[in-house]
Structure formats: C-alpha cells, structure tokens
Amino acid sequence: MKEMSANTVLDSQRQQKHYGITSPISLASPKEIDHIYTQKLIDAMKPFGVFEDEEELNHRLVVLGKLNNLVKEWISDVSESKNLPPSVVATVGGKIFTFGSYRLGVHTKGADIDALCVAPRHVERSDFFQSFFEKLKHQDGIRNLRAVEDAFVPVIKFEFDGIEIDLVFARLAIQTISDNLDLRDDSRLRSLDIRCIRSLNGCRVTDEILHLVPNKETFRLTLRAVKLWAKRRGIYSNMLGFLGGVSWAMLVARTCQLYPNAAASTLVHKFFLVFSKWEWPNPVLLKQPEESNLNLPVWDPRVNPSDRYHLMPIITPAYPQQNSTYNVSTSTRTVMVEEFKQGLAVTDEILQGKSDWSKLLEPPNFFQKYRHYIVLTASASTEENHLEWVGLVESKIRVLVGNLERNEFITLAHVNPQSFPGNKEHHKDNNYVSMWFLGIIFRRVENAESVNIDLTYDIQSFTDTVYRQANNINMLKEGMKIEATHVKKKQLHHYLPAEILQKKKKQSLSDVNRSSGGLQSKRLSLDSSCLDSSRDTDNGTPFNSPASKSDSPSVGETERNSAEPAAVIVEKPLSVPPAQGLSIPVIGAKVDSTVKTVSPPTVCTIPTVVGRNVIPRITTPHNPAQGQPHLNGMSNITKTVTPKRSHSPSIDGTPKRLKDVEKFIRLESTFKDPRTAEERKRKSVDAIGGESMPIPTIDTSRKKRLPSKELPDSSSPVPANNIRVIKNSIRLTLNR
C-alpha cells in the first residue's frame, strides 16, 4: 500500500510539472493553519458582495438558457429566409458561449455577463445587428437595448430579466454549430475576418486559462481575492492603463502554476511575492507560444518593433497570442509595483498572525498621497450627452498620462480610476459634470531655487485628441467641454466633500500607526521632499476646434469661480509651439481676443510673456541611476539631459524560439534586452530548466512610447468645421 501511495504521489508530481513553462517552485500541500487563513479570507471578502447565492446563480442560468434558445430560433429563421433546404435548417444549430469573469467563475453580485453568439457561415454580421437586434427588441424582459457596431469588438448590450449582457458575434466557416463545439481548436479561426477572431478570442483565452491551472476552485478563490484587492486599491482598469480582469486572471494563474498544491490564502501571499520581484518588461506566459499556419499577427518583440515598447507584457495563452496590457504606462506600472510590495508586506503580517485580511482590503489614501494634483473635468449640457462624453474622455485619459510622463519635470502621473461628480457652482452653464484626479510628482532640479513648468502643451494635445475623436465619430455637441486645473493638496476641499478627504486622511494615519518594520515603505514624506511652494496659472483660452456639424452653434465660454484655488482665467490668444518629437497637431483657427481677468491669490505669480521664464521641455529617457520614483517624493534631475531615442534599436540576431526561464523566487524570464543578458546571467546560478534565448525588449521608462493601435488620432484628418472650445494653459513655479 505504501509503495502504491508513493507511486501515486510521484505520478501526481509528474503531472503537475506540465502546468506552465517552468517547474513549480513548491509542491507543498496546505497545512491546517493554511485552511484556517483561507476561511478567514473568505469571511473578509463576504461583506463586499463577491459571492452570489444559489438563487442568483440559478437565475443567470435561466437567462442564458432563454438567450441560447433565442439564438437558435433566430439562426433557423435566417436559414429559412436564405432558402436553405429544410434538412439543413433543422440541424443548423447555433450556440451562446460565455467568457470573462462569469466563465471563469469569479463574477460578483450584479455583474454583467460577457457572451458570444456563434453562428454558421451563412449568417452574416449584418444579420446579427439587424434581424437579431429586432428580435431582441420584441422579446419580453429585454431592456436598455443598444448596438455598438463600430466598437473594436462590435457588441449588442442589453438587460435580460435584470441581468446585464454584452453579446458579441462570430460566424464560423462551417455549416452547422453543434452543442459540443470546442472553440479552443485553432482551425476554427480559418477564413474568419478580424472582427470574428476578436470576438472568439475572449472565449478562447478564458477557456485556455482554465485548462492551464492545476486546481480550478483554488484558482477562482484566489482570483476573487486579488480582483477585490485591485479594485479597492484603485488599480483595476485596463482603460486607464492599469490591469483588467483577464490580466489579473493570468497573473493569478501563473502563481497557481508555480504553487500547484497551495491553499488560496498561501497563493494570495505568493502572488504578491512573485510579482513584487518580477523584472518587467519580462513577459508573463502561461504556456509556450504555439506557432500556426494561419499567419495571424501575434505578440513577438523579435518581429514587431512596437512590442518591444510594452512595459508590463502579460501574454494571452490562446492563438493568436496578444499582450493584454499594452495600455500600461510608466506611471501605472510604478503604482502597481508599489502596490505589489505593499500587499506583500501586509500578507506577511497576516500569515504571521499580526494582522487580518481586512487590512489588505483597505483603500489607499490617494488624496493625502501627493502634494500636487491635476483635476480633469468633463461636462455636458444634457444627461445623455454627458454619458457619451464621459465615456470618451475616460477612454483617452491614458493619453494625458502619457503626455505628462514625457514632460521633463514630471516623474509620475497617477490617475485615480474613480470619477467624482463635479461642483456645479464652478460649471453653472452645464449641469452634468464629472471629475478625475491625477496625482503628480515633479522632479527636483539640482542647484535650482525655483522651477517654472509649463503643462500647456501636454494638456492641449490631450484635449485635441479627444475633440478630434469625438468629431470623427460625430459625437461632439454643443456644451461638451474638457478642462484641466492644477491644484495643491490643501486646495482639494474646493472640489471634494470633506468626508472623502477626511476619511482618506484618517485611513492614512491609521495605516501609519499600525505599520510595523515589515510595512515601512521606501516612500519619502511629501512635506519634506517636495519643492514647497508653487505658483500656477490656468488660462482658459477659447479657440476653434472640430465640430460634427457645420451649423453647430458656438459653445459658451466657461468662466471659473473666483474662489477656485490658484486658478486664473485669462481668455486671450495663446500661441504654444509644438513640442519636438510629438506628432499630435494642435488644432486651431481664428482666436477670440476677448480678455477677462480674475485677480489671483497673493501666492500666485503670472508670467508676463508666454514662453519667457519657462524652462523648455526636453524629453529624456529614464536614467536608471536615479532609481524608481517614490510615489510621494521628488527625484533629482541632473543638468545633463539626453534626448529621447527616436527609433527602435536594430536587432542583429533573432532567436528562433520563444523561451521563458524563471529563477527560483526572482523569477527572471529570458525575454531580455541583449545588452543586459550577460549581466543577468551572472546574477543567476539557479535557473530552472531551459536554456537562455534572449529576445530583445526595451524598457521605456522615460522613452517615447508608440501610440496605441486604438488611437489613430495623429493620422486622423483635421476637420474643416469648427466649434469654439475652452482650452487651459497651466503654468506653475515650484520653489524649494
């Protein structure tokens, strides 16, 4: 019996080695204390509504069953209308697949369902958005039905018996769709258009993730905890440059592969251990990328120069492999890595019995964290316009973050994913206002008593991008405005209610009081390390910008309240020369010369001449010698400035096979920049399996990032029609 038991254990261990691209770090089974900590983790998560009860789960199944029947009926009707033989119509089939958090089994109460409608080859996409849309319109229980055909992944959105559903469409090059269809088969992608491939990709990635984890239930519980933590800490948003649900799932799946037998409480701790020490931009891979003869574009930095600029690559496991985190910027990566380290310190305390899981789920003190903030405001005159406008502005905020990162004097631009309702007293002409806050860290300049910083171009190129996109999709309407204002921490009470600021401050002090040696971070004090006083000027400058219609009336000029902190509105012509190396044009035409002034507070000084007394912006790559910026400190900037690289480095050799090798604990993969491969090799003597095959990547901490494929703004035509839009000029002086 003992021999059989030993053989069983050995067989189990051999099987576990097939998960992931390296051997596991530990095969240790959980102890009793691990199960106790796991139960405590579950108890800590329950108040946040992350678990659905049986009744709610069954209701979702009923709704999906109804939707599946509707799809089959519709496909049958379409088949008849296209004169297919009755024998074919009877067996044509059709099916609904789910993906995303629901398919992974980690959806929360009230969450929507991502679903895919799969149809046979004779059903067109136009049928889906026309006849099926009409069928849904007349179906009982359907509410808020809307189609988004021009989206990156075209979708129909609706509520069905109280459940929100996002339904995408794909037709396969086969005559019938059986109930046991396996979408993981790569051959299903043959002869499909790109929109169908994108639609199928969600299901294929989700299913592949579930096939690549050793224990699905442990994976699900761990992922629930990590997703809740990420949302609570303000780093859950693919749109804003953090990570979305699929990316978090892949990071947790990789952790499960490395510790295949661990309990969820242990895996949460190991998650922070692994990714607080991960050497980005080495990619996270769940399996070796597979080649295919379908010749679809895949993520490969050896072949695609743009892939070398990705800062935090997490590669989807299903063909065609893609980087799910191409929106990540230098700032968002810095914030996330800091959060990984903080999470590791907290879970260390929890597993030592010094703290409990509720501490891990405490929100951050964002409004006490920084000395300087930029308030971004989006407003519209009607609720319907506001919903559209806010969605577009939010989707482009990462453009603003990128612009600010390229500013010579900015170390970090941290956007808070949560938006807030705006103060209507500041926007009397628009009743619908939303605000976002960006925490800013400015660089310390050596041997300078004061620094004059001009953020005008960074803001204007961002607003031009948004207005151009709105015009291109015929969204831009009278009353839609964007404004940006620089404020200091002590002035935030002009924008946010006291309970929000006080609550955050209280939590911050509580964190400090309860922190032990293991929780002391490397952050410097804001009050001691930043340049102290600042003087800034916000100039609202109206000028012509694109409109969707030639007869559109002019938008009224926004007048700021004189009580607004450190904000000075000077509505006058402003000529801002474009910064070197940026391709986004500033749209402008005839400028209204009307001038309105408001006396500034005594602490403010307005530069008398635009461009004078302002240190010119020179974009530079990040200097590794300066180290990572502390999230609430100031880093030094040297006098010697190196221009940004304007082209991708050449590749002398191209390895033939992707290979990822991780070290024990350090977990370094071999997707290395060739220039540092030897250095890293000397650091490592305990590599796990496989030989090193360097693939060039580029750490673009302070280098020029290539534009996202979603943002073809610089190449968009400049419209001839104009609508006058308020623009902000932001200049400030930082003193020691």
Swiss-Prot record:
Enzyme's top EC category: transferase
Compartments reported by the entry: Nucleus
Residues carrying Phosphothreonine: 654
Listed cofactors: Mg(2+); Mn(2+)
Keywords tagged on the record: Acetylation, ATP-binding, Magnesium, Manganese, Metal-binding, mRNA processing, Nucleotide-binding, Nucleus, Phosphoprotein, RNA-binding, Transferase
Residues the record lists as Phosphoserine modifications: 23, 29, 525, 599, 648, 684, 708
Residues bound to Mg(2+) 1: 112, 114
Residues that bind Mg(2+) 2: 112, 114, 166
Region named Disordered: 506-564, 673-720
Example GO biological process: RNA 3'-end processing
Binding site for ATP: 99-101, 108, 112-114, 166, 227, 236, 245-246
Regions of compositional bias (Basic and acidic residues) in chain numbering: 673-685
Record bears the keyword Kinase: no
Family: Belongs to the poly(A) polymerase family.
Record flagged with keyword Cell inner membrane: no
Sites of N6-acetyllysine modification: 2
GO molecular function term, any single one: ATP binding
Tissue-specific expression: Expressed predominantly in testis, and weakly in other tissues. Overexpressed in several tumors.
Descriptive protein name: Poly(A) polymerase gamma
Annotated InterPro entries: NT_sf, NuclTrfase_I-like_C, PolA_pol_cen_dom, PolA_pol_NTPase, PolA_pol_RNA-bd_dom
Function: Responsible for the post-transcriptional adenylation of the 3'-terminal of mRNA precursors and several small RNAs including signal recognition particle (SRP) RNA, nuclear 7SK RNA, U2 small nuclear RNA, and ribosomal 5S RNA.
E.C. number(s) listed in UniProt: 2.7.7.19
Site (Interaction with RNA): 152, 157, 327, 398, 532
Major site of localization recorded for this protein: nucleus
Low complexity composition-biased segments: 521-532
CC per GO annotation: cytosol; membrane; nuclear body; nucleoplasm; nucleus
